[in-house]
């Protein structure tokens, strides 16, 4: 589209991102038909994990990208412009513990510190600093819900859309930290050199 390359997130935001690109006039049929192919040069699309989108956009491998606000908040060092809140894919960043007695609160009372497992160490650290609580952050990559069930941590900070996975693992939300939605981001150089094309995209998205 007007010579622009888009970084497209696979996963939870994938389907709605493709629908949005369809509305912009891009042909996403090949993307929808190929689960394993990642680069679609004719359409100007490259697909990847949401957490990689800011990296590719910052490096100029893509002019524009779509990713969650959670990714941007966890990686503030990425030099990208956040252009638009796209409004879809809402998820809550939450502080959760095992149902029943709040083990995290008990640990704070007894020890002055609680252990919190998360994939989002920066977001978690900033939150507990902001709320005046001592937390030892344990970074994990996989199923965060396991941590309080196995004794690795008293609590977790994680992203949830429906809360189903938390409930199925006997966890309850104690606090909501933030709500994250999909955002449109741009490479700073492309934002200058391809301003007309990018402004057109932003204008059309704002117009719905």
Give the ranges of each region predicted by the language model.
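Domain-level signature for soluble enzymes in the chorismate/prephenate branch of the shikimate pathway
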Residues: 1-208
